């Protein structure tokens, strides 16, 4: 069991910013097309984080609206395919899983910004 924890600790990424559900983020993902590798940016609102950040199995779900259609993508937090994560805006939400955000459209889909004091 200790060997597994040691192996997980080696694969953990320490360069990731602290973010939570409701935050607007830009996820820079490495995509391999043939022999070329490029970076694609997926920008949206974090709906949930799964398994926190202590485990290599930690994931987070990001939702964006593209041409009027909602697109959700689940990213492994410690994946080597993620180049970097930028927090664009901190959101003020009361729940840790904001699934109700899927049903909202227009101005109702706005999330208030968390102010730093």
Swiss-Prot record:
SUPFAM superfamilies registered for this protein in UniProt: Translation proteins SH3-like domain
UniProt keyword NAD present: no
GO biological process, one term: translation
GO CC term (a single one): cytosolic large ribosomal subunit
GO MF annotations, alphabetized: structural constituent of ribosome
Cross-referenced InterPro entries: Ribosomal_bL19, Ribosomal_bL19_sf, Translation_prot_SH3-like_sf
Alphabetical list of Pfam families matching this protein: Ribosomal_L19
Family statement: Belongs to the bacterial ribosomal protein bL19 family.
NCBIfam families from the UniProt entry: rplS_bact
Role this protein plays: This protein is located at the 30S-50S ribosomal subunit interface and may play a role in the structure and function of the aminoacyl-tRNA binding site.
Protein name, entry field: Large ribosomal subunit protein bL19
Organism this protein belongs to: Desulfosudis oleivorans (strain DSM 6200 / JCM 39069 / Hxd3) (Desulfococcus oleovorans)
